[in-house]
């Protein structure tokens, strides 16, 4: 990145409407998972240990799922992986909602199965499994969006595009706790899952729409690179996985 060129934020949408819109939605999703998720746990009478376990599991799952999702996105149309990941995340938010909202008494099962479900519910095992899977679907969306927008850019614009995407993420991230708290106030603690469902679904639906508007045009030399959601432009520049052969650049 000895030679870099600037790119305006408004131009990012022209280059990749899906990646830009998706990143804006991800800015609402990620802060809600981490910040309002802890509030949700407190409102649901989780112990300090249980809230800590929740944060541990979503962080671990989000990190682990970066690799298989990234692997698939490098071998198939990245938009398809983005859409499937977003919509599967939507389904998981619904399952998370019902895992802590529905009593086994409302389900037409035998008494033995109801006892098993009640035991699982009391220990929140099902919730932890579902929320871990959800984190695995939602947290890699940040890196997927960066990789997808870079599919349409030369390498010298990667850093500038990453900075622009960070700003887009930050704008929505600043308002996410306030919007999410509105849902939790009006729909109860489980309103967080309604909030997450809306933005996950928006990404998937908009992705399907964009596939009808643009054919696949990808940079064959660009690959997915797992990145934390708080990566800085400098961090992108220093990461060898996102860079180019500087020796070759110097020779040219």
Explain the meaning of each model-derived region:
Residues 139-153:
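Intracellular juxtamembrane helix-capping segments at the cytosolic ends
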Residues 66-77, 184-185:
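Helix-to-loop junctions at the C-terminal end of transmembrane segments
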Residues 88-108, 112-119:
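C-terminal ends and interior cores of transmembrane alpha-helices
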Residues 17-52:
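Extracytoplasmic gate region of multi-pass secondary transporters
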Residues 48-49, 153-165:
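Loop-to-transmembrane helix entry/capping segments in MFS-fold secondary transporters
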Residues 182-200:
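A membrane-interface helix-boundary motif in multi-pass transporters
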Residues 80-95, 197:
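Structural signature of the two symmetry-related core transmembrane helices
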Residues 112-113, 210-252:
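Intrinsic disorder in cytosolic terminal tails and internal cytosolic loops
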């Amino acid at each position: 990145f000895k030679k870099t060129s600037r790119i305006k934020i408004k131009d990012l949408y022209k280059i990749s409407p899906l990646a830009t819109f998706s990143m804006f939605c991800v800015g609402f999703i990620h802060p809600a998972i981490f910040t309002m998720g802890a509030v949700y746990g407190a409102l649901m009478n989780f112990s300090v240990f249980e809230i800590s376990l929740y944060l541990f599991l979503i962080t671990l799952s989000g990190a682990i799922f970066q690799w298989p999702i990234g692997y698939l996105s490098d071998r198939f149309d990245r938009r398809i992986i983005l859409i499937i990941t977003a919509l599967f995340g939507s389904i998981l938010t619904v399952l998370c909602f019902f895992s802590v909202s529905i009593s086994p008494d409302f389900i037409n099962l035998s008494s033995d199965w109801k006892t098993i479900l009640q035991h699982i519910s009391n220990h929140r095992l099902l919730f932890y499994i579902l929320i871990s899977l959800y984190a695995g679907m939602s947290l890699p969306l940040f890196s997927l969006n960066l990789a997808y927008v870079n599919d349409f850019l030369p390498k010298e614009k990667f850093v500038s595009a990453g900075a622009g995407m960070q700003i887009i993420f930050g704008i929505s991230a600043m308002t996410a706790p306030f919007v999410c708290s509105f849902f939790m106030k009006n729909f109860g603690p489980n309103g967080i899952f309604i909030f997450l469902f809306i933005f996950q679904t928006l990404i998937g639906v908009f992705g399907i729409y964009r596939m009808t508007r643009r054919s696949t045009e990808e940079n064959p030399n660009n690959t997915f690179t797992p990145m934390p959601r708080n990566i800085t432009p400098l961090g992108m520049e220093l990461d060898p996985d996102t860079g180019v052969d500087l020796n070759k650049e110097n020779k040219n």
